[in-house]
Amino acid sequence: MSVLLFGVSHRSAPVVVLEQLSIDESDQVKIIDRVLASPLVTEAMVLSTCNRVEVYAVVDAFHGGLSVIGQVLAEHSGMSMGELTKYAYVRYSEAAVEHLFAVASGLDSAVIGEQQVLGQVRRAYAVAESNRTVGRVLHELAQRALSVGKRVHSETAIDAAGASVVSVALGMAERKLGSLAGTTAVVIGAGAMGALSAVHLTRAGVGHIQVLNRSLSRAQRLARRIRESGVPAEALALDRLANVLADADVVVSCTGAVRPVVSLADVHHALAAARRDEATRPLVICDLGMPRDVDPAVARLPCVWVVDVDSVQHEPSAHAAAADVEAARHIVAAEVASYLVGQRMAEVTPTVTALRQRAAEVVEAELLRLDNRLPGLQSVQREEVARTVRRVVDKLLHAPTVRIKQLASAPGGDSYAEALRELFELDQTAVDAVATAGELPVVPSGFDAESRRGGGDMQSSPKRSPSN
């Protein structure tokens, strides 16, 4: 079984396609369930951000697994399979490992080196793990990807500028307006992205921030934090948006809503009320939602300048220094090689364990025959014979089992495990039973502070029945 990746990202598709594919957390669970309904798929995890939708799965067959995942995503998006595949990319086995390591390191982000994606990978794993849809393979892959991402950020300067989608978008806004100092800003959405936007706006010296959110209490919490940093701020319900826009200079919208929250009518109303002049006071709107928060028609209005995810990735400040990128890629390559060696050795371990179990069974059978032939044998003598026989077997098996693990670490090493099974007539069922017995280690079930406090163990059986 190998890891298969089916994905669509900002590098392969325009924003309008990513909008159709956008997946919230409840959708993740449904998609995983549908993928796992196929007997060809044994583990699955969905990574969904504003820039990508990727399904990682452990499959028994490449083409069959690809068809299953592609069909599920096509039905979710409303696109035909043929239309979806025009924008999709596929990675298999080693290439899938390399891709996830690069993603976790920020090398495949719209803003190269940004750290937010590391948390998004962590969250994707946590969702899959809490729903028991990851087994040994994806557990080890996700954990290693998180480790690689942390190593890249600690050993290189790829994130030295502290760039993120938010910081780059606001940098573009600042360039358009000349300065953000003293301006009036509106933040739509009080989640993690909204909070990050508030931090950057505060540092830029804006004069006033208005926070709008469907949940007024969340908007009030964020507004309170902004005021504590020394910037006047107030929280408003989302239905006040049209009036708020009239006084705004810069707007950051990042709600995760399924349809636009900033309508053409809202912006028309704001422009009419403010009597703006495009040259002296444009309205800059940073649309960082996926699907888009801003009606696409808004970008065609005079006096309005819209920054979206597409424009962010083409901004020069979104790209880290070439030397840092190269250093990060070297780390990823080394980590991929190390990971694959470990996986190959892990794959041969059940065969070696099954061989040792077979040898132990033979020893016990022969000792039983000895008891039947020499019933008068004293217990001290029998124990000495048993120790001697076991030592002989251990010595005979030691060198070949150590050597086969070494050989198995090289590409194509799985053939040695197969040869061992053939030579000693090891039943594949017995080998699989050994592998399944140690499917997953017991680890905390979450990554954030709440899940650590709550505790919980990994489940030994990765695949659960799909929900109805």
UniProtKB/Swiss-Prot annotation:
Protein name: Glutamyl-tRNA reductase
InterPro entries hit by this protein: 4pyrrol_synth_GluRdtase, 4pyrrol_synth_GluRdtase_dimer, 4pyrrol_synth_GluRdtase_N, GluRdtase_CS, GluRdtase_dimer_dom_sf, GluRdtase_N_sf, NAD(P)-bd_dom_sf, Shikm_DH/Glu-tRNA_Rdtase
Catalytic reaction(s) noted: (S)-4-amino-5-oxopentanoate + tRNA(Glu) + NADP(+) = L-glutamyl-tRNA(Glu) + NADPH + H(+)
GO molecular function: glutamyl-tRNA reductase activity; NADP binding
Subunit details: Homodimer.
Keywords: NADP, Oxidoreductase, Porphyrin biosynthesis
Domain notes: Possesses an unusual extended V-shaped dimeric structure with each monomer consisting of three distinct domains arranged along a curved 'spinal' alpha-helix. The N-terminal catalytic domain specifically recognizes the glutamate moiety of the substrate. The second domain is the NADPH-binding domain, and the third C-terminal domain is responsible for dimerization.
Further remarks about this protein from its record: During catalysis, the active site Cys acts as a nucleophile attacking the alpha-carbonyl group of tRNA-bound glutamate with the formation of a thioester intermediate between enzyme and glutamate, and the concomitant release of tRNA(Glu). The thioester intermediate is finally reduced by direct hydride transfer from NADPH, to form the product GSA.
Originating species: Mycobacterium tuberculosis (strain ATCC 25618 / H37Rv)
Annotated positions binding NADP(+): G189, A190, G191, A192, M193, G194
GO biological process entries: protoporphyrinogen IX biosynthetic process from glutamate
Gene designation per UniProt: hemA
EC annotation from Swiss-Prot or TrEMBL: 1.2.1.70
Site keyed Important for activity: positions: H99
CDD domains: NAD_bind_Glutamyl_tRNA_reduct
Pfam families: GlutR_dimer, GlutR_N, Shikimate_DH
Biased composition, class Polar residues, residue ranges: 458-468
